Regions:
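Glycine-/small-residue-rich beta->alpha transition segments that form the dinucleotide
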Residues: 114, 119-123, 279-280, 292
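Core beta-strand elements of the Rossmann-like FAD/NAD(P) dinucleotide-binding domain
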Residues: 105-114
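A glycine-rich dinucleotide-binding beta-alpha-beta segment and adjacent secondary-structure elements
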Residues: 265, 271-337, 365-378, 500-553, ...
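Glycine-rich phosphate/pyrophosphate-binding beta-alpha loops
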Residues: 333-341, 397-399
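Internal hydrophobic alpha-helix adjacent to the cofactor/substrate pocket in enzyme cavities
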Residues: 27, 343-364
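An anion/pyrophosphate-binding glycine-rich loop and adjacent beta-alpha core
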Residues: 2-3, 20, 149-285, 293, ...
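Conserved N-terminal/central alpha/beta ligand/cofactor-binding core
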Residues: 1-91, 106, 118-135, 142, ...
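Extended, charge-enriched "interface" segments that sit outside catalytic cores
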Residues: 395, 401, 412-577, 581-585
Length: 585
């Protein structure tokens, strides 16, 4: 609709986070650009959850909002296979149940073999600030109209969702000295498995808190809040509530944490993470000035809530193609998700599968045991969603296999088989695999003398050695790392110095957790037996013994495999057994 806002970050100027960082690395492993752009434009990097096990470690970058969009535009324009056209699409060209192109607001018909809808929050979007309603897709941009009405007419089930964004403030008016400082990691990490530059300097974020006075001021606007008066019909994100929602739901809390995040290198604009609101702007402003550090704050623009249309993702195949209209794909918030990362993953998968569809090839489907992207799409297609869906590590039952450090070894070989240009990434995967073999062999074969390691063991609260022991056995102890051996044993340091730090880190995780990883892989093998049993178009009403709910859900969703069927809400183990008997015939 507007080429000047391509890749504009609508909300938080950040990429990654818990489970989201894993998705960004998976996109990169599959040949996507998200991680590359993030590495080139971030102002701070942090690895979250380092106090927990490696399955929970999640990279997060604070981004330069303006540079992020600029870098994306440059990369897209550098691709000769991408064409651009600035206009609003108001309808689809559909003939005999097959999409043939799109129709624009100027009346142009653009033919296409496949169409992917990635409408974000723009479908009949309405911004709410207090008692005011504004038709918009986001601040300063018009809403998209026409598509929802046509899709509903074609038989699609539509719904409304809501999200919000906080006020932006002038960083020059803040008292940074009274806030907690949050520095980035040293050494600095990155997202992409390609040769992107590492950040040489970082900008800090800050932390402050609301208080009782802030809450009292905010409450004075509740009678004008569209959320409490019923003007907002859409359901908001459970895990990213507005400040008024937090005060209402957690009335026993005297304060709520706020992250004060710079929007870039060369701007004074600041994003107040945790202060999302749709209250009248004067209430937002008055309350904000009671936050420590914000006593003299000037607001650039108030926070707002936005309502928009979405379509139940149970209307999609696992390829993200719609069941009702052939060659039509949905990706992003139109499917009920929230977040840049979830949307980017769906866009990549929809794009891959649209290409495969045109070329009469089987769709590319990632299993739950292969990627967070697989978990995301499987959840959406099989369970649907009644609220904006956000990815968490807890949603992935095989998360010890789906770590951020091994996204490349999991997915890059699959991307290569599809014909995606991942030559450099694949060469690095081979190098990483070879490094692991050498490191594992060295650690299993090297014996350590007590005198070389006992001091560090004592410092770590671990029992000293009685006799020399294989390095591998010592490494299995809690709080012991390869770096501990490098510090005290020159031959270990000399050997490890030939490898990249990331390769060493990945090898260490694989060695320390190899027992858990082996058990998880055995479990996956059992589950995959069901994933490999295909289900073709079946009238489930003809299968005796299935529950009425199972017949209804299976006929509606038409799962591709027994495994997919088993994850549909309402399908019992007894129903799965009946399906196995039926398919066996």
């Amino acid at each position: 609709m507007n080429m000047e806002t391509i890749a504009k970050m609508s909300c938080n100027p950040a990429m990654g986070g818990v489970a989201k960082g894993q998705i960004v690395r998976e996109i990169d492993a599959l040949g996507g650009y998200s991680a590359i752009v993030t590495d080139h434009t971030m102002i701070q990097f942090r690895m979250l959850n380092l106090s927990k096990g490696p399955a929970m470690w999640s990279p997060r970058a604070q981004s330069d909002r303006m540079r992020f969009a600029e870098k994306w535009r440059m990369m897209l324009e550098a691709n000769p296979n991408i064409s651009f056209w600035q206009e609003m699409v108001v309808g689809l060209v559909v003939k005999n149940g097959v999409v043939k192109g799109v129709r624009t607001s100027l009346g142009l018909e653009i033919p296409a073999k496949t169409v992917i809808l990635t409408n974000g929050t723009f479908l009949n979007g309405i911004i709410h600030i207090g008692e005011r309603k504004i038709s918009a897709g986001r601040a300063g941009e018009r809403a998209s109209t026409g598509i929802t009405a046509q899709l509903v007419e074609l038989g699609f089930e539509a719904g409304r969702m809501k999200t919000g964004t906080p006020a932006r403030v002038d960083g020059r008016t803040l008292n940074w000295d009274v806030m907690e400082v949050q520095h980035g990691d040293e050494p600095v990490g990155k997202f992409s498995f390609t040769d992107t530059p590492k950040l040489k300097k970082q900008r800090p974020c800050h932390i402050t808190y609301t208080n009782k006075k802030v809450h009292e001021i905010l409450k004075t606007g509740f009678d004008k809040s569209p959320m409490f008066t019923g003007r907002i019909q859409g359901i908001g994100p459970r895990y990213c509530p507005s400040i008024e929602d937090k005060i209402e739901r957690f009335a026993d809390k005297d304060r709520h944490q706020l992250f004060v995040e710079p929007e870039g290198w060369e701007t004074c604009e600041v994003y107040v993470n945790g202060f999302s609101s749709s209250l009248p702007e004067e209430i937002q402003y008055k309350a904000m000035r009671l936050i420590p550090g914000f006593e003299n704050a000037k607001m650039f623009r108030p926070g707002y809530a936005i309502e928009y249309d979405f379509f139940q993702p149970t209307q999609l195949k696992v390829s993200l193609e719609t069941r009702l209209i052939k060659n039509l794909f949905f990706a992003g918030q139109i499917n009920g998700t929230t977040g840049y990362e979830e949307a980017g993953a769906q866009g990549l998968m929809a794009g891959i599968n649209a290409h495969l569809k045109i070329n009469d090839q089987e769709p590319f489907v990632l299993k739950r045991s292969e990627a967070y992207i697989g978990v995301l799409i499987d959840d959406l297609v099989n369970k649907g969603t009644e609220e904006p869906y956000r990815m968490f590590t807890s949603r992935a039952e095989h998360r010890i296999l789906l770590r951020q450090d091994n996204a490349d070894t999991r997915l890059t070989p699959l991307a290569d088989k599809l014909g995606i240009d991942v030559k450099d990434r694949l060469a690095r995967v081979h190098k990483k695999d070879a490094a692991y073999e050498k490191i594992a062999k060295f650690i299993h074969n090297t014996s350590i003398e007590p005198s070389d390691i006992d001091q560090i063991l004592t410092e770590r609260g671990s029992a000293p050695l009685r006799q020399k022991m294989k390095m591998h056995k010592i490494l299995l102890r809690p709080n012991m790392s390869i770096n501990d051996f490098r510090k005290s044993i020159p031959k270990v340091d000399a050997f490890m110095s030939q490898f990249e730090e990331e390769f060493i880190g990945c090898a260490e995780i694989n060695l320390k957790y190899e027992g858990y990883i082996r058990k998880e892989r055995d479990q996956v093998e059992k589950i995959n037996r069901l994933e490999n049993v295909r289900l073709y178009e079946i009238d489930y009403a003809t299968i005796k013994g299935l529950s009425l709910e199972a017949v209804e859900k299976l006929n509606q969703l038409q799962p591709a495999t027994i495994g997919q069927a088993s994850r549909i809400s309402g399908i019992s183990p007894a129903d799965v057994s009946i399906l196995l008997v039926y398919v066996g015939r």
